[in-house]
């Protein structure tokens, strides 16, 4: 995991540094870390940011809600990064944002109530991850008339999302076993039980 993340972060900053050819635009790549709680995902990101000397903002996806509801809206993630950069926009635009518990904002199934912390948060995060201009307050985490606003471009911000994704292996096994055939040459149901690369299928 350390090697893969290091290479991913290296490629990201190499892309930022190699913008001498304006005709060639390389799309940004973000990262997804899967691992159980307490496996060191946050520590790994903190160490990387410290070594690279770039601002880091860590947020919990479960605390994010749609704008206008109690809780942090999606843009507050960029506000935290701007604060970590000492309100230096240029520095913040090269920082790292780590969003933990990303698996907890999956769309709720079979519910008629408004999903203020699920799909709407996903849509808001998608806009940030792809790269967009976000208006954020300077020196505060929420917008109000007394606080000046500044624009931060998320095009060069590295977003790393982390989550435990429980039962993901069961979902993948169920999908792979649907392709199984019948007869003497059919795949066994437990064929993927000991597959170390199951999560990559």
List the model feature ranges, each with a label:
Residues 1-57, 61-70, 74-201:
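AAA+ P-loop NTPase nucleotide-binding core of proteostasis motors
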